[in-house]
């Protein structure tokens, strides 16, 4: 059996028709799943419904939907709906997003992120299982004894959580089915998996059944193309995506590099130089760059560090011909 590989559409400059075509090709080639992001453009459950109608086998995931802009009940309703239309192929990926998006775009207070994630997981599980919402064990609201006015296709859908901090990762062990880390050095995954195991032990769960599914930047481009793009992506996440990744990478020994990159990125006059400050060590730890054969071999090697399901970020701002070459080149071996 081929080792599972998934694909993730990039959230910036999103082209709906292009990614629908990509999902159809991934379905034909035997990819495990296709994940769609949600930022401040397209609404993700509607897009996944469209993909469900036009694909046959591939699983479809939210990568990720934030836990603030919809109520837990609405997330459960949406999950049940897409799961039915896809005939049981839906995966719910959730996370907290960030303060700028939640407060600045959605107008919701960015508060109690751990409790917010936990309530979404608990309410979704309860409602899909046919239970009353008041029985979910949620803590942020006093729910009345509502049940879904439909019978979900499955009594449970897989729930993956994007998280970078210890308490949030331990909570995955307590209640979720998968962990989605981003820009977590692959050779440090054991730390996060140990936190999952600690949470699972407290809840009496089997940690070995919890999937580690990192969003993975693979750049199978010849020459210096992959390295150049890797530098641009890393500098963007460090300089333009808040403190999450700086905090994470500083803990893993990249603090000075992150500060230098962030300082350059903060000034528009020097922003172009931020990519040049990305070191070879950061590229090696956070991405896979090189010719296709190297990327495939490296992806296989990194599974030994605890990667169960690599979710490959599809390159952005590329014509269909290049996107198709990526999908075919990185497809799971049959």
Feature-to-residue mapping (PLM):
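Internal, glycine-rich beta/alpha segment that forms the wall or movable "lid"
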Residues: 3, 18, 76-178, 182-210, ...
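Active-site mouth loops of central-metabolism enzymes
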Residues: 4-17, 65-72, 153-164, 218-221, ...
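N-terminal beta1-alpha1-beta2 module of alpha/beta enzyme domains
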Residues: 1-62, 157
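Hydrophobic faces of well-ordered beta-strands that scaffold small-molecule active sites
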Residues: 3-9, 34-36, 60-63, 90-94, ...
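An alpha-helical appendage that flanks or caps ligand/catalytic pockets
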Residues: 111-150, 194-304
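Acidic (Asp/Glu)-rich catalytic clusters
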Residues: 27, 48-59, 79-90, 173-174, ...
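Alpha-helix-loop-beta-strand connector modules within alpha/beta enzyme cores
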Residues: 45-65, 69, 116-123, 202, ...
